[in-house]
Amino acid sequence: MKVGVLALQGDVSEHIDAFTAALRKRGYTEDSPVIEVRNPEDLAGCAALAIPGGESTTISRLVDKNGLYKPIRDFKGGIFATCAGMILMATDVGDPRVHSLGLLDMTVDRNAFGRQRESFEADIRVQGLDGGSFHAVFIRGPVVTEARDGVVVLARTDKGIVAVEKGRHMALAFHPELGGDLRLHERFLKNLGV
């Protein structure tokens, strides 16, 4: 079992640490690495890919520049996308500068929570997540304004939808990798049969 983290921008090391801990918690050893993905060759053998937050227009440009657009679209593993990663997963982002992957049929509102100084933390209820509410860190995040074609809504705030999943993909407007709560990472891995 190998997990890749798109290492073009964002909190890459935090995603690596969170997925490493989640894999160990699920009984996987050092033989199940979490690696940085910078080019198409790095995706080989990965069962999952995390797309971190950052700035969505920049990440989409770097995905194109590094030849990763088609390989990620064709990737057969699961994708765990946070913040800007959620934007890249959507079919409709409302900004022509963002070359989205279009893997989840949904519309997102970029920066729905405002500027960086308006970042906040909140306890949210996530559908089907045992153990009570989830403490979520929102940093200038998006919201989903419309989910279509089997995209399942997992969580909402008063601003809109902040967590979705469909099949092997999960997209979150917040940053679960910044807290110690691994339940969403574990749920994602479990959905992949890991």
UniProtKB/Swiss-Prot annotation:
Pathway: Cofactor biosynthesis; pyridoxal 5'-phosphate biosynthesis. PANTHER family: PYRIDOXAL 5'-PHOSPHATE SYNTHASE SUBUNIT SNO, PYRIDOXAL 5'-PHOSPHATE SYNTHASE SUBUNIT SNO1-RELATED. Catalyzes the hydrolysis of glutamine to glutamate and ammonia as part of the biosynthesis of pyridoxal 5'-phosphate. The resulting ammonia molecule is channeled to the active site of PdxS. HAMAP family: PdxT. One of its GO terms (biological process) is glutamine catabolic process. The keyword tRNA processing does not apply. In the presence of PdxS, forms a dodecamer of heterodimers. Only shows activity in the heterodimer. L-glutamine binds at G54, E55, S56, R110, I139, R140. NCBIfam families: PLP_synth_Pdx2. This is Pyridoxal 5'-phosphate synthase subunit PdxT. The active site is at C83, H175, E177. Belongs to the glutaminase PdxT/SNO family. Its EC number is 4.3.3.6, 3.5.1.2. Pfam families: SNO (PF01174). InterPro entries: Class_I_gatase-like (IPR029062), PdxT/SNO (IPR002161), PdxT/SNO_CS (IPR021196). GO terms for molecular function: glutaminase activity; pyridoxal 5'-phosphate synthase (glutamine hydrolysing) activity. GO terms for cellular component: cytosol; glutaminase complex. It catalyses: aldehydo-D-ribose 5-phosphate + D-glyceraldehyde 3-phosphate + L-glutamine = pyridoxal 5'-phosphate + L-glutamate + phosphate + 3 H2O + H(+); L-glutamine + H2O = L-glutamate + NH4(+).
